[in-house]
Amino acid sequence: MISWFIPVFAIVFVSWYFIVIFNRLVRLDNERKNAFSQISVQLKRRYDLIPNLVETAKAYLKHENQTLESVINARDHAEATRREANKSPTPQALGELMGAEAILGGALGGLFAVVESYPDLKADQTMGRLHEELVSTENRVAFARQAFNDAVMVYNTRRESFPDVLLAKMGGFQEAILWDEISQNERVSVKVSF
């Protein structure tokens, strides 16, 4: 009687252990996806501020249409890329979003460089309020990125640890990329000052 009990117990135990590992990987993957969605929420907030910023600047920057158009085009591209990444936050989609964010950062940097040469615009109350909102949103985005990177590190560490690595490969759990894994050349910091 004991001869059949040990193999059955071993099979049940190993099956149970694999279920626990699989569920842990699913939970960590979902936490990573949730952390990305927090970035997405803050980026959406940022993208929603930009048209107001451009409209406020438009009254003062009549001869800077190219600058304003580049900001709006970069914003629209980043928003479309964000929506695609929301559907499926794959490493490729996140890489495209990071690239779109770098382009938008460069366009915003150009806008704020132009704003510096217009004292009336710098003194505008609406522009000041939008500037404060943008700075606050940038801080929220930075915090969300940090939380995302933390979730990615936990997920990747677990995914690459034995015995989880065996089930991760069979279960299709792909390595996640950190938000900051873009080249130094693509990074453009948005400097806003009034």
Could you say what each language-model-derived stretch is?
Residues 1-194:
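A helix-centric hydrophobic-segment signal that preferentially recognizes long
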